[in-house]
């Protein structure tokens, strides 16, 4: 028998110290990694529920285990809320991650060796869009499209490439692209060559849910997303479609279970249901509007301080700063900003002369800072501090500037806590 008074702090103090340290790090650092966000206490409460004990292989009403009546309620709630949120008529909430959702799409609709055409990782795509080190580039024949020197997708070049390689699937979506993707044009290209259009909207799902970024559902055969980036929910994946093809829906369900996964994580599905309910609230749209406003405000400061922004701006939650002209690497910038308690990630930029582990840029995202209450004035000030640190790298005053910036960061983090 377990007592509810049991706690980690008493039982495993070494682990608890790591948890406490991470809690403190999140409160005392400014989080600008575009793929991260803060989950609400309600989402975390669902994740910590007793549903973690329940096995529920199968789908609602068609389980392989008994005692799933409440798991069915939870999963159906999540499905219906996701349908309402995105305008889908098919939803699978079981994928454990975005990568597993993508794997299920490939497995359900393709055969090994089929050709896929996705955005190159070096140009802003994702590992699972056909990178050679990923299953998507090992199991399938992956062709890659890129972006122009201006940081934009060239749809004419994409069309020509699609006609040349004749893919069975075109993959839309990105992990580091700051402009609006023309989903309609991508579908037109896919139709011309008889390909599926699959869109991974993991990075912009929250913006899509709020109506601020174009919804790919009306154009794609199938869409996937994570639930923890701009959506702000638990770590997990999601598959959606409104194509109306029941055969595709059956293939996708079978590719998730039993082909790709066993039992679903019911406690995480419960947390997804909470996240979708939160995203249906009126204040969620205001939050996402502020995410975009804050990203645009930061871009203007970087440009004023003579830092090149890839594509010269942003129409979503992220942007890339190209450091080539300043003689800096992304690795050095990431490290210096980290010492000042500002967390970003190094990122490749178009025609990057550096290796992927070094890079010549940084990726900056605003979902987390916006969720903890930063407004446009706050992020403009923050962008200025970041430029101060970047300007000082390798100079005599570097340590002094970093220390001064860290003090400012700690002060604003105290004023705007993540969890008050």
Swiss-Prot record:
Residues with site note (Plays an important role in substrate specificity): 228
GO molecular function: glycine hydroxymethyltransferase activity; pyridoxal phosphate binding
Catalysed reaction, written as an equation: (6R)-5,10-methylene-5,6,7,8-tetrahydrofolate + glycine + H2O = (6S)-5,6,7,8-tetrahydrofolate + L-serine
Class of the enzyme per the UniProt entry, highest EC level: transferase
Names of required cofactors: pyridoxal 5'-phosphate
Binding site for (6S)-5,6,7,8-tetrahydrofolate: 121, 125-127
Alphabetical list of InterPro entries matching this protein: PyrdxlP-dep_Trfase (IPR015424), PyrdxlP-dep_Trfase_major (IPR015421), PyrdxlP-dep_Trfase_small (IPR015422), Ser_HO-MeTrfase (IPR001085), Ser_HO-MeTrfase-like (IPR049943), Ser_HO-MeTrfase_PLP_BS (IPR019798), SHMT-like_dom (IPR039429)
Membrane-spanning residues: none
SUPFAM superfamilies: PLP-dependent transferases (SSF53383)
Pathway: One-carbon metabolism; tetrahydrofolate interconversion; Amino-acid biosynthesis; glycine biosynthesis; glycine from L-serine: step 1/1
GO (cellular component) term, any one: cytosol
N6-(pyridoxal phosphate)lysine modifications at: 229
Keyword Cytoplasm: yes
Keyword Cell membrane found: no
GO biological process: glycine biosynthetic process from serine; tetrahydrofolate interconversion
Keywords: Amino-acid biosynthesis, Cytoplasm, One-carbon metabolism, Pyridoxal phosphate, Transferase
Enzyme Commission number(s) of this protein: 2.1.2.1
Location within or outside the cell: Cytoplasm
PROSITE patterns, sorted: SHMT
HAMAP family in alphabetical order: SHMT
Biological function: Catalyzes the reversible interconversion of serine and glycine with tetrahydrofolate (THF) serving as the one-carbon carrier. This reaction serves as the major source of one-carbon groups required for the biosynthesis of purines, thymidylate, methionine, and other important biomolecules. Also exhibits THF-independent aldolase activity toward beta-hydroxyamino acids, producing glycine and aldehydes, via a retro-aldol mechanism.
Quaternary structure note: Homodimer.
Similarity field: Belongs to the SHMT family.
Name of the protein in question: Serine hydroxymethyltransferase
Species annotation: Aggregatibacter actinomycetemcomitans (Actinobacillus actinomycetemcomitans)
């Amino acid at each position: 028998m377990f007592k509810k008074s049991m706690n980690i702090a008493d039982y495993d103090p070494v682990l608890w110290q790591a948890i406490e340290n991470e809690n403190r790090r999140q409160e005392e650092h400014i989080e600008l990694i575009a793929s991260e966000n803060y989950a609400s206490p309600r989402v975390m409460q669902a994740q910590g529920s007793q549903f973690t004990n329940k096995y529920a292989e199968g789908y609602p009403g068609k389980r392989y285990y008994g005692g799933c009546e409440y798991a069915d309620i939870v999963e159906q709630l999540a499905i219906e809320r996701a349908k309402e949120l995105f305008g889908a008529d098919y939803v699978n909430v079981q994928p454990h991650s975005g990568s597993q959702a993508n794997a299920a799409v490939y497995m359900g609709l393709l055969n090994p060796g089929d050709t896929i055409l996705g955005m190159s990782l070096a140009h802003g795509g994702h590992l699972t869009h056909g990178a050679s080190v990923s299953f998507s580039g090992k199991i399938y024949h992956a062709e890659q499209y890129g972006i122009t020197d201006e940081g934009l997708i060239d749809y004419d070049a994409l069309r020509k490439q699609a006609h040349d390689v004749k893919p069975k699937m075109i993959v839309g979506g990105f992990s580091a692209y700051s402009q609006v993707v023309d989903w309609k044009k991508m579908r037109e290209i896919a139709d011309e060559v008889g390909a599926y259009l699959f869109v991974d909207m993991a990075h912009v799902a929250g913006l899509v849910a709020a109506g601020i970024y174009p919804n790919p559902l009306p154009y794609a055969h199938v869409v996937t997303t994570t639930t923890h980036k701009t959506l702000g929910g638990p770590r997990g994946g999601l598959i959606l479609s409104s194509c109306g093809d029941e055969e595709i829906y059956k293939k996708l369900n079978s590719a998730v279970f039993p082909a790709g996964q066993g039992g679903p994580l019911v406690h995480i599905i419960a947390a997804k249901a909470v996240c979708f309910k939160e995203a249906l609230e009126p204040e969620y749209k205001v939050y996402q509007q502020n995410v975009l406003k804050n990203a645009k405000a930061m871009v203007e400061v970087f440009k004023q301080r003579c830092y090149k922004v890839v594509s010269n701006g942003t129409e979503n939650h992220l942007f890339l700063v190209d450091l080539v002209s300043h003689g800096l690497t992304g690795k050095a910038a990431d490290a210096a900003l980290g010492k000042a308690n500002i967390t970003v990630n190094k990122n490749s930029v178009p025609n990057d002369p550096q290796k992927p582990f070094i890079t010549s840029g940084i990726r900056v995202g605003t979902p987390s800072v916006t969720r903890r209450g930063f407004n446009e004035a706050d992020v403009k000030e923050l962008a200025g501090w970041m430029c101060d640190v970047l300007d000082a790298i390798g100079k005599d005053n570097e340590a002094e500037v970093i220390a001064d910036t860290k003090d400012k960061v700690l002060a604003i983090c105290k004023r705007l806590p993540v969890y008050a």
